[in-house]
Amino acid sequence: NNIFDQFFNDFFSQNPNNKKSLGSGVLINKEGYIITNEHVVARASEIRVALGDKREFKARVIGADMKSDLAIIKIDSDQFLPFIAMGRSDDLMIGEQVLAIGNPFGLRHTVTTGIISALNRNIRVGKNKVYSDFIQVDASINPGNSGGPLLNINGSLIGINTAIYQKAEGIGF
């Protein structure tokens, strides 16, 4: 195994026998509630959460909605849990600067920046699934970012990174 092969295995290889998946989420209160995507936790037999301070927790699903692709999971801790303030998505403007945070390709705690490209987008996933009222951004979103926070420039939560348009770069939702 040479270094070239190792690079491609680390970043591009898909092991069909590997039952693990990777996603992101965002703590929304000190009680340990986390918003993520439904597709991140769907069919999971165990959910593990790693915080930026390297603490790890087992989590449980509190609720999930396939139609909106959102889920709430919970971790339990008797220590302080850092959480993000909720923003408002009803007064967003096209051109507004945003930050997308996540774990693209397993690269933990990655931050990318961009702008809101459009509002109220409907996107089709597969043949029968349509998601409504999405925020379109040009911040880099990749596999592993799903469930991570989309923040306004003040650091308030305004959305959840959910999908990318795979036929082009720079189109995320």
Where do the PLM segments sit?
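Serine-dependent protease modules
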Residues: 1-173
